[in-house]
């Protein structure tokens, strides 16, 4: 096999979402050296980067923070289940308090050891992003599949979920932004708590983030990024947020074209204003130019600053245990087949994610009575909302060939990937520093033309979402939805739906958390979402047909091609090729105490029991307008502050 072919497999940029799964297995049979390519040395650092490389260190003995596994009568003030986005933030903040003892239970391990550079190099994001049938790494992902999705031609979708320290911050697209001010006002209204308004959220957003502005690294003159300094704090941290070192060439063309459609320039999508266009920030360390995760930030600092945190890796939570007063007092766990328990003196906090937090609630006796009784689980608290209200969206759009360099070259280009690896190893420059999507725009639905909706659907959106909440998110995706393997340059003008009405669920058919839960997002099950999907696609196509983008587009639309014109044809293409946003929320939703569908109160406490909270994306009452990672970090900061304050 040619070296260029092996290198191409090693990089696995945007893998075309679905068609990659159809590639011949013979291709993969010849890649025994793939691991060495992925784990090739990552080159020299400058002096500043060398000091910030995220190595695992501790205040005292590093080993004091791990285990001991299986010993009886281990007891901590707080026991946190899940070492992901929220779990590690909670663990750091609670362990900072003198006298607090904290245990963190994580089913996975360290992603650096389990997945190599696939989790470190920004553009290697897509190495295991999709299940193509030939390359899997169950060490750091749960390999969860959905029920057949009727709205997506009955596809059973792989749903990426991190099983590692860092959780999905080690798996996702690194996109960092915040919701609109109206979204957080809606949150405050739905849970009956004014501490969820934008002004009250902002300090929690600021506390966790160490922002490096666009001048940290040089940017092209035609790729100006503007930020609202009031959105950030100079004392924030530990999570690095910055712009990728490389600016995608196509992004400046999209930026210029959208001027003609009336898009205003906004200040980075983190000051509560989304409607408009901007380059977008990522959780990338601007000095090492590597992925930043909850593990490389919160955990690394906690290990150095505190002796109050114990971590149990490769340890699966089986269920939460309660005393006679329905107070959570322990977590039953399993390590390599051995069952034991970790006791909690104050609280148990579930941060296992949108699928596994509701699963743990149900196997512990908290959930819909009918579901629990079918599995002979004693009902501790009948909460019909557990596992319900799942919300996520999809990403879709047309693909065009272009005359400027794009990440699609990495698939099949004989020279592009070796050059990019050399650039990254020796200079921390080039295509591998950017995960392939750095320019976004948000828009309300139009009143007429492409992007417009029926009066009925538009009225439903207006009635259910705030005025500053966008209908669509547009993304200049520097690659293809279906891989081409020819080394040519393509880009996909993509869209995600922000005002969806489809609602799915998470359930169980087993009492064993070793078994994956049942997950049914029900994408495009609501006709209004189907209408929005077609309208968003047509709007993307309208952008690419503008004269400015025609100057850089090299020929006719590649996918789906101009023969797809009717609504049914476009919807069919979307159903076959669109992918998950991997941003599910809402399956253990906050709400008012008198709401029978609420699972949590506004302090993230599970209703009907004591000493148990859920803090992660499942806690959201609804999907906010955009990527949830920034809000999950802030929610963890907020609830940790509540706990420390005695709430």
Swiss-Prot record:
EC nos: 4.2.1.143, 4.2.1.142
An individual GO BP term: secondary metabolite biosynthetic process
Induction: Expression is positively regulated by the dothistromin-specific transcription factors aflR and aflJ. Dothistromin biosynthetic proteins are co-regulated, showing a high level of expression at ealy exponential phase with a subsequent decline in older cultures.
Catalytic activity: (2S-3S)-versiconal hemiacetal = versicolorin B + H2O; (S)-5'-oxoaverantin + H(+) = (1'S,5'S)-averufin + H2O
Cofactor: FAD
GO terms, molecular function: flavin adenine dinucleotide binding; oxidoreductase activity, acting on CH-OH group of donors; versicolorin B synthase activity
Keywords: Cytoplasm, FAD, Flavoprotein, Glycoprotein, Lyase, Signal
Signal peptide: 1-26
Cell compartments where the protein resides: Cytoplasm, Cytosol
Binding site for FAD: 85-86, 106-107, 172-175, 617, 628-629
Primary residence: cytoplasm
Entry function: Versicolorin B synthase; part of the fragmented gene cluster that mediates the biosynthesis of dothistromin (DOTH), a polyketide toxin very similar in structure to the aflatoxin precursor, versicolorin B. The first step of the pathway is the conversion of acetate to norsolorinic acid (NOR) and requires the fatty acid synthase subunits hexA and hexB, as well as the polyketide synthase pksA. PksA combines a hexanoyl starter unit and 7 malonyl-CoA extender units to synthesize the precursor NOR.
Name under which the protein is recorded: Versicolorin B synthase
Organism: Dothistroma septosporum (strain NZE10 / CBS 128990)
């Amino acid at each position: 096999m040619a070296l260029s072919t092996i290198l191409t497999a090693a990089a696995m940029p945007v893998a075309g979402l679905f068609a990659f799964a159809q590639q011949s297995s013979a291709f993969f049979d010849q890649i025994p050296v793939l691991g060495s390519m992925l784990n090739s040395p990552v080159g020299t650092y400058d002096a500043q980067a060398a000091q910030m490389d995220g190595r695992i260190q501790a205040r005292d003995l590093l080993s004091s923070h791990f285990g001991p596994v299986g010993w009886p009568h281990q007891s901590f003030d707080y026991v946190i289940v899940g070492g992901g986005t929220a779990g590690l933030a909670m663990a750091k903040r609670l362990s900072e308090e003198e006298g607090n003892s904290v245990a963190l239970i994580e089913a996975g391990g360290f992603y650096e050891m389990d997945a190599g550079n696939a989790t470190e190099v920004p553009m290697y994001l897509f190495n295991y992003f999709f299940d193509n049938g030939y390359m899997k790494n169950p060490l750091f992902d749960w390999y969860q599949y959905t029920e057949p999705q009727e709205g997506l031609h009955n596809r059973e979708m792989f749903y990426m979920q991190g099983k590692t320290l860092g959780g999905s911050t080690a798996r996702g697209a690194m996109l960092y932004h915040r919701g609109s001010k109206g979204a957080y006002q809606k949150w405050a209204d739905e849970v009956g708590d004014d501490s969820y308004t934008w002004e009250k959220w902002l300090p929690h957003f600021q506390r966790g983030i160490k922002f490096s502005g666009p001048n940290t690294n040089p940017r092209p003159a035609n790729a100006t990024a503007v930020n609202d300094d009031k959105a950030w704090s100079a004392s924030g941290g530990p999570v690095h947020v910055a712009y990728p070192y490389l600016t995608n060439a196509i992004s400046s063309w999209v930026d210029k074209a959208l001027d003609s459609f009336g898009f205003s320039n906004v200040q980075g999508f983190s000051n509560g204003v989304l409607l408009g266009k901007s380059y977008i920030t990522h959780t990338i360390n601007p000095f090492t130019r590597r992925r930043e995760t909850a593990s490389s930030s919160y955990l690394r600092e906690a290990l150095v600053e505190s002796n109050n945190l114990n971590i149990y890796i490769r340890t699966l939570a089986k269920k939460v245990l309660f005393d006679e007063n329905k107070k959570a007092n322990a977590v039953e766990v399993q390590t390599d087949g051995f069952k034991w328990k970790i006791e909690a003196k104050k609280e148990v906090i579930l941060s296992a994610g949108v699928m596994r937090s509701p699963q743990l609630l149900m196997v512990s006796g908290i959930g819909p009575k009918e579901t629990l009784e079918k599995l002979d689980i004693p009902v501790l608290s009948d909460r019909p909302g557990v596992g319900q209200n799942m919300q996520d969206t999809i990403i879709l759009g047309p693909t065009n060939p272009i005359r400027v360099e794009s990440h699609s070259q990495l698939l099949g280009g004989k020279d592009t990937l070796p050059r990019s690896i050399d650039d990254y190893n020796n200079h921390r420059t080039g295509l591998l520093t950017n995960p392939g999507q750095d320019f976004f725009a948000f828009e309300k639905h139009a009143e007429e033309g492409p992007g417009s909706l029926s009066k009925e659907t538009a009225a439903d959106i207006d009635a259910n979402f705030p005025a500053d909440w966008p209908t669509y998110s547009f993304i200049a995706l520097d690659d293809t939805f279906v891989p081409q393997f020819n080394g040519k340059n393509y880009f996909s003008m993509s869209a995600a739906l922000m005002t969806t009405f489809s609602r799915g669920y998470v359930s169980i058919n087993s009492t064993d958390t070793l078994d994956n839960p049942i997950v049914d997002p029900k994408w495009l099950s609501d006709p209004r979402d189907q209408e929005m999907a077609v309208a968003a696609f047509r709007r993307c196509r309208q952008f690419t047909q503008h004269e400015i983008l025609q100057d850089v587009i090299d020929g006719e639309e590649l996918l789906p091609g101009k023969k797809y014109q009717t609504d049914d044809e476009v919807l069919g293409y979307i159903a076959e090729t669109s992918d998950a946003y991997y941003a599910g929320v809402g399956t253990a939703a906050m709400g008012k105490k008198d709401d029978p569908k609420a699972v949590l109160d506004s302090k993230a406490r599970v209703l009907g029991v004591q000493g148990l909270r859920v803090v992660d994306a499942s806690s959201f009452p609804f999907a906010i307008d955009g990527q949830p990672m920034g809000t999950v970090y802030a929610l963890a900061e907020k609830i940790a502050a509540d706990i420390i304050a005695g709430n």
